[in-house]
Amino acid sequence: RFPGIVANDDVTLKIRKGEIFALLGENGAGKSTLMSVLFGMYEPDEGEIIVRGKKEKIVSPRYASELNIGMVHQHFKLVSNYTIAENIVLGVEPQKKALGLFPYVDMKKANREIAELSKQYGLEVDPTKVVSDLNVSTRQRVEILKMLYRQAEILIFDEPTAVLTPQEIDSLLKIIQNLRDGGKTIILITHKLD
């Protein structure tokens, strides 16, 4: 609930593992709010969330990530002057110890792992490229890789086609099918049927 507004009322969703689930509704219908609750950005006033048969109180995006839930927001959350790899590992950096004592970020390992994930799901990105040099569809792929790098199994896409060209939409749909074929559960939020 927001002051004077009930964003979601009497909502029940049952989504099975490996399913592509579309949540369709007009702008302002509460779709993104509902997914923001599932991702821990908002706490529900009432009701319950059950993930893999267990009742959960998802209090933050970090906790959602621990539950293997990831979200690609309509407005990307990327640092423009960082590389793709730096954006993806931000907050979960792989570390090594110099001389066995001093921790530092192992970007070689990160680049290798990201390149492998990219290839596995048909995302086709170069982890060493700087985000400010990327087009919108490639930035979206970086957001998808951020989820995959954190082992997300439930992937929420908020209005994923809103800023894409028809060709980019076709490419995204293939990526989503690859993700589903890889055992991921997909939730698409959209107000468009095409």
Regions found by a protein language model. Name each.
Residues 1-194:
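Glycine-rich phosphate-binding loops of nucleotide-dependent enzymes
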